[in-house]
UniProtKB/Swiss-Prot annotation:
Peptidase S1 domain span: 44-281
E.C. numbers: 3.4.21.-
UniProt main location, coarse: membrane
Protein name from the UniProt record: Serine protease 46
UniProt keyword Transferase present: no
Length: 314
């Protein structure tokens, strides 16, 4: 670990371990123009050395100036989050976004204005289609602390048992005692089979309902008795492959924070790749020249959104 810090739970011991995914990505160009890249440095915060730049796509979403949810940068203009985070109001003027935030509360960065809210048209409760995007009034400028995350293509799925990371500022619960972290952090989790997840949540089934966890969801569990809690809504579930981070999920819901027998549930981003693409339809999508030895199958790895000549690796 960097910065000489100690990790008693061993959660951060292997942040660069690649995820096992069904296809491989390809990307060229410098990291500053790429997605899913990090530039980790050390900084003294409140007298303690902490890592900064580890999760540069992470943003905080505010309602009337108060933090309510997390989100992730997928483009100069666009933020990905959970639909249930935006139920307080459909008026974009009431929401703002902060990028490059390392600790909460934060008074060092400016609030960015939101001009448009797009909630999935099928979202009617917190259980399914829990995805939304926000459009910023002005494009953000990339820096070592502000970078976009990659999105998966439709057929990109993490294998069962893959270790991924949940990123956010929300509540964490260990050994029955909740605590509030103020620095953005990652929690190591493993992908759980949806059928097992369904079995754990079968008591929630309604009459004539055959399953609760749909194809638009992913489930994870933690081996350390830690888990995501209510204040992590909208946070990113990211997996790393070939040193590139890909957002595979958006924190949606769970049953009672920290209960290991109940997996955390996420919106599967790969399920909504085409939906996101349709919402950002005013952009021009172009392809990238690639080495001849790469097959088209390899190009189905992830999406990189760039404002000029937007690139979708599909």
């Amino acid at each position: 670990m960097a910065c000489g810090s100690v990790d008693p739970h061993g959660l951060l011991s292997s942040p660069l371990a690649s995820a096992r995914l069904n296809s491989l990505p390809y990307m060229e160009g410098p990291w500053i123009w790429s997605c899913g890249q990090t530039n980790i440095t050390c900084k003294v915060v409140n007298g303690k050395a902490v890592e900064v730049g580890k999760w540069p796509w992470q943003v905080s979403i505010l309602f009337l100036g108060m933090y309510i949810c997390s989100g992730s940068l997928i483009h100069h203009h666009w933020i990905l989050t959970a639909a249930h985070c935006l139920q307080r109001s459909k008026n974009p003027a009431k929401y703002t976004v902060k990028v490059g935030v390392q600790t909460l509360p934060d008074n060092s960065t400016s609030e960015l204005l939101v001009t448009r809210i797009v909630i999935h048209e099928n979202f009617i409760n917190r259980m399914s289609d829990d995805i939304a995007i926000l459009k910023l009034k002005y494009p953000v400028t990339w820096s070592p602390l502000v970078q976009p995350i990659c999105l998966p293509s439709f057929n990109l799925k993490p294998s069962i048992g893959t270790m991924c990371w949940v990123v956010g500022w929300g509540l964490e619960k260990a050994e029955g005692h909740p605590k509030t972290p103020y620095s953005v952090q990652g929690l190591a989790v493993r992908i759980v089979n949806n059928e097992i997840c369904n079995h754990r949540y079968q008591f929630l089934l309604l009459k004539n309902q055959k399953k609760f966890i749909g194809n638009d969801m992913l489930c994870t569990s933690s081996e350390w008795g830690l888990d995501t809690c209510q204040d992590t809504s909208g946070s990113s579930l990211v997996c790393q492959m070939n040193k590139t981070w890909v957002q595979m999920g958006v924190v949606s819901w769970n049953f009672d924070c920290g209960r290991r027998q109940f997996p955390s549930v996420y919106t599967s981003t790969s399920h909504f790749t085409q939906w996101i693409k349709r919402q950002i339809g005013d952009l021009k999508f172009t392809s990238m020249a690639v080495p001849s030895f790469l097959s088209p199958f390899i190009l189905t790895g992830y999406i990189l959104l760039v404002s000029l000549g937007s690139l979708w690796l599909l």
